């Protein structure tokens, strides 16, 4: 690479690094949210134990895992996220839903009406949960971020995911502003693999 090309590359990288409108892409692996009652059934005499904090405030991956049992198969050792919620919810990718024979709909978190059921199993207990979904892609953002992007809660935007060799535009991305949210777009593992997303991938809103 000659000096002119190298200088242009460095300038482009610096510009991208300083761009306030770029959005970190977070890849959401399959996971489970549990009510306190369901947690106690699956893990009697245990407390939910923090494995590592997540990017959004007060949320964490716990040390506890469960097996998801569907009509055609099982997904083993699926991480429980904390803290406990008002409703238990299972989030898996489309490919996983097909593998275990569950017709999971694409929904935002918490929108569980009509979602199918699966059995959750640990060595100490089992529960049947109605609430298996494929998470609809969305962007967590602060209220200040929302003002900067010119969006409000529930707005739909398109985001160009700026991954190497596979730049991809994702439509139908839901904006989810809240005062304490940290800016991050969430996609599932199927979407991430299709777009060659790694742990240092960013996106940018291209249409609002």
Curated annotation (Swiss-Prot):
Binding site for phosphate: 85
Highest taxon of the lineage: Bacteria
Enzyme class, broadest EC rank: transferase
Residues engaged in binding Zn(2+) 1: 31, 33, 91
Subcellular location: Bacterial microcompartment
A single cellular component GO annotation: bacterial microcompartment
Cofactor annotation remark: There are 2 Zn(2+) ions per monomer; Zn(2+) and CoA bind inbetween the 2 domains in each monomer.
Metabolic or biological pathway, per its Swiss-Prot or TrEMBL entry: Polyol metabolism; 1,2-propanediol degradation
EC number of the protein: 2.3.1.222
Entry-linked Pfam families: PTAC
Keywords, sorted A to Z: Acyltransferase, Bacterial microcompartment, Metal-binding, Transferase, Zinc
Binding-site residues, CoA: 27-29, 72, 79, 193
Cofactor(s) the protein needs: Zn(2+)
Main location: other
Keyword Transferase: yes
Disulfide bond residue pairs: none
Domain topic, free-text comment: Formed by 2 beta-barrels, each is capped on both ends by short alpha-helices.
The family this protein is said to belong to: Belongs to the PduL family.
Task performed by this protein: Involved in 1,2-propanediol (1,2-PD) utilization within the bacterial microcompartment (BMC) dedicated to 1,2-PD degradation by catalyzing the conversion of propanoyl-CoA to propanoyl-phosphate.
Protein's name according to its UniProt entry: Phosphate propanoyltransferase
Organism of derivation: Levilactobacillus brevis (strain ATCC 367 / BCRC 12310 / CIP 105137 / JCM 1170 / LMG 11437 / NCIMB 947 / NCTC 947)
């Amino acid at each position: 690479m000659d000096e002119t090309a190298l200088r242009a590359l460095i300038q482009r990288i610096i510009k991208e690094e300083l761009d306030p409108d770029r959005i970190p892409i977070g890849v959401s692996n399959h996971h489970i949210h549990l009510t306190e009652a369901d947690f106690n059934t699956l893990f009697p005499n245990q407390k939910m134990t923090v494995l590592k904090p997540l990017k959004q405030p007060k949320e964490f991956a716990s040390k506890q895992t469960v097996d998801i049992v569907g009509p055609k198969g099982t997904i083993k050792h699926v991480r429980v996220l904390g803290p406990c919620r008002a409703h238990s919810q299972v989030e898996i990718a489309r490919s996983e839903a097909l593998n275990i024979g569950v017709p999971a709909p694409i929904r935002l978190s918490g929108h569980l009406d009509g979602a199918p059921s699966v059995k959750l199993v640990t060595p100490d207990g089992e529960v049947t949960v109605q609430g298996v979904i494929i998470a609809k892609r969305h962007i967590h953002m602060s209220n200040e971020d929302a003002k900067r992007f010119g969006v409000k809660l529930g707005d739909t935007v398109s985001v160009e995911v700026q991954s190497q060799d596979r730049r991809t535009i994702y439509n139908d991305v839901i904006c989810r502003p809240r005062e304490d949210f940290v800016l991050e777009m969430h996609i599932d593992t199927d979407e991430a693999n299709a777009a060659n997303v790694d742990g240092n991938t960013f996106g940018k809103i291209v249409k609002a």
